[in-house]
């Protein structure tokens, strides 16, 4: 089996450990965030950032207007890039990050009407450019199908942590540069998909936004890895970006005073109880039936949540209702 060249140093392992710790805190906070609003906001940021890296000049506000179906005055190609990116991100839940067929399908949507060979591997020579400077010359087109098959086989079978695999895949993808256009945006999308297999919370994390804010370091990491002949510099760069993204979003706005806002750790059952209270008026009997436990068990859990100042009872015992504070 093909083995991409990389070295796991202490910095990489330290970053991976810190990310693993922070992602769990992020998931807990996410439970009480407005996921629909967060998903939409991050989708806009992700699309704007990923396209801006590739030279799209539209502002985040204009990208938002296009996504919301408003008419805008802008170059047609740039508008099409936004619409295509949106259509591709809508496929996110259905795409298998371990499937070459799905990669080609996603590229076909992403580059529809932009390049004639959308959805197909390139038949011409390509390279990675930082402005007008070529920082990496990609392998000949005839080698692309075999190289991609090897890369996907490694991705599926490797025992490395998915967090690290996602970074290695991203670099190897850019090294191969399998398409005539759209390699950057596809590489970033595919890393997000791989990360999503490790933890679905990554659907809510606009990693592309952090890369956009550090474009020069992004290209520097690719160049350093190419010179070194192994991708440790790129792995470190991407892990640092993921960590920075998690730190940036660790304070997701939630209603002030909730357990999540105060870093109180809740059990899975307690989180389910909170979700049910948020969904509408419920009684202890209804919660017990839904969770398939005794009413006495739920009564104890509710008392704990009241003691933690997470929930409260509004009104009388007979006519009142439970609320999340």
Where are these regions (language model features)?
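FIC/Doc superfamily catalytic core
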Residues: 1-325
């Amino acid at each position: 089996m093909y083995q991409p060249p990389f070295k796991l140093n202490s910095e990489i392992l330290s970053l991976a450990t810190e990310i693993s710790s922070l992602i769990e805190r992020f998931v807990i906070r996410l439970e009480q965030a407005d996921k629909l609003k967060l998903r939409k906001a991050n989708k806009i940021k992700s699309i704007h950032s990923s396209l801006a890296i590739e030279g799209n000049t539209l502002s985040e506000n204009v990208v938002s207007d296009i996504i919301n179906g408003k008419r805008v005055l802008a170059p047609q190609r740039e508008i099409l890039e936004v619409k295509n990116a949106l259509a591709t991100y809508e496929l996110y839940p259905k795409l298998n990050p371990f499937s070459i067929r799905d990669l080609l399908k996603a590229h076909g949507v992403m580059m529809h009407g932009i390049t004639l060979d959308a959805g197909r591997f390139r038949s011409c020579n390509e390279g990675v450019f930082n402005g007008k400077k070529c920082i990496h010359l990609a392998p000949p087109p005839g080698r692309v199908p075999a190289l991609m098959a090897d890369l996907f086989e490694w991705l599926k079978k490797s025992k490395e942590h998915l967090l690290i695999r996602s970074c290695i895949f991203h670099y190897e993808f850019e090294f191969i540069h399998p398409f005539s256009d759209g390699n950057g945006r596809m590489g970033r999308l595919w890393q997000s998909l791989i990360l999503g297999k490790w933890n679905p919370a990554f659907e809510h994390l606009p990693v592309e936004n952090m890369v956009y804010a550090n474009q020069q370091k992004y290209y520097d990491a690719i160049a350093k890895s190419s010179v070194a002949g192994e991708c440790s510099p790129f792995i470190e760069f991407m892990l640092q970006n993921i960590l920075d993204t998690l730190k940036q979003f660790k304070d997701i706005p939630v209603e002030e005073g909730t357990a999540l806002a105060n870093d109180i750790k809740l059990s899975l059952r307690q989180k389910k109880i909170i979700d049910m209270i948020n969904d509408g008026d419920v009684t202890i009997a209804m919660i017990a039936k839904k969770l398939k436990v005794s009413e006495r068990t739920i009564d104890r859990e509710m008392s704990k949540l009241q003691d933690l100042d997470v929930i409260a009872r509004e009104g009388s015992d007979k006519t009142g209702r439970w609320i999340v504070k």
